[in-house]
């Protein structure tokens, strides 16, 4: 059975205090506190690397989702990547089973929600060179309550190019600038309550920014993309009286 789509947008890495074990010149930890995957953090040396979040005294972070983008974890031979939590910064426990990244593309994984003061992403020793990481997401995710409508294509792409023509209009050549992912998805039979409590808060706080998108994390965990709303518009028309609909066009750089 397929999983329903989810997005991960409310990133606690942007809100809590962040500390890195080491920093390479030109790759500060502050690069992780936005949504730009081309600005990355990188450590130094060959020892264990880690990134730690601290919610602060008397505060906690609730996390149920880990997202990574703009990284080279697989290429650098990282194994047993771990996400841990703690309440005292001394005793650490696994949020999920440590895993070996199978790709340098987007990674998104969910786990039973944990609420604690500290969280830490641990890169064990044994890598080829210190890996880079552009986006670290930690927080909760927003699940869509229904499946996409018939006709959904998770693989939509468009090539951005520049063409050179002769004076007579003949094609001399085409240069590809980049390939962007463009995904159109429609949802029907959405409850008004979900629209009010889930989609409207997302749109109000995050409608202009990128987010992680996974259309079927259960069967297609490799199809995780960092996307944004092509047209940040809030439109959820009623259908059949009591249900609402949502039509989205999502775009981002095709990795």
PLM features: what roles do these ranges have?
Residues 1-50, 54-80, 89-255:
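Extracellular/virion structural assembly segments
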